[in-house]
């Protein structure tokens, strides 16, 4: 589910594949999303939120990336969906979690890359931090989110936990 007007940022990220058809042509977007279906939905509106809740009625796992500030601004609480759908597992992908001392902090890919420990093994320790090209922090986040979505059903079965903060 993508937020209008532009949806996934990768749709407008190059390199672009020259095509005659009026189809997606971002190589990054195609690499990450081939075979997937998507819908544009503005869940910040009352009707959009109702549509999202309706979609979640048949879902096992809901993966979102709404940080604490976004939830506070939109009024989407932590129990918003799991209270209506008690079997739903929500994977919350945020830079620093939804609780704790850093939950309200913003982040950037270079910060996440540094915190992953990978920056410790590249570059010169006496120089500025180096960011390797590509979208590695985002991919690492995706891998962790995927792991959480595989582990969460087992946790839910044994502990009845509804939310995993990745």
Description of each model-found segment:
Residues 158-166:
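Single conserved hydrophobic/aromatic residue that forms the stacking wall/gate
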Residues 1-155:
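N-terminal helix-loop segment corresponding to the beta1-alpha1 unit
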């Amino acid at each position: 589910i993508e937020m209008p007007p532009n949806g996934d940022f990768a749709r407008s990220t190059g390199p672009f594949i020259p095509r005659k058809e009026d189809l997606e042509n971002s190589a990054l977007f195609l690499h990450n999303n081939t075979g997937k279906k998507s819908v544009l939905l503005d869940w910040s509106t009352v009707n959009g939120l109702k549509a999202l809740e309706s979609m979640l009625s048949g879902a096992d796992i809901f993966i979102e990336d709404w940080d604490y500030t976004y939830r506070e601004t939109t009024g989407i609480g932590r129990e918003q969906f799991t209270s209506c759908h008690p079997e739903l597992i929500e994977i919350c992908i945020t830079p620093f979690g939804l609780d704790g001392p850093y939950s309200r902090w913003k982040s950037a890919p270079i910060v996440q890359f540094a915190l992953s420990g990978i920056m410790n093994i590249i570059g010169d320790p006496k120089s500025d931090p180096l960011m390797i090209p590509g979208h590695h922090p985002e991919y690492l986040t995706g891998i962790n989110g995927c792991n959480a979505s595989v582990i969460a059903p087992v946790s839910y079965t044994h502990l009845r936990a509804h939310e995993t903060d990745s």
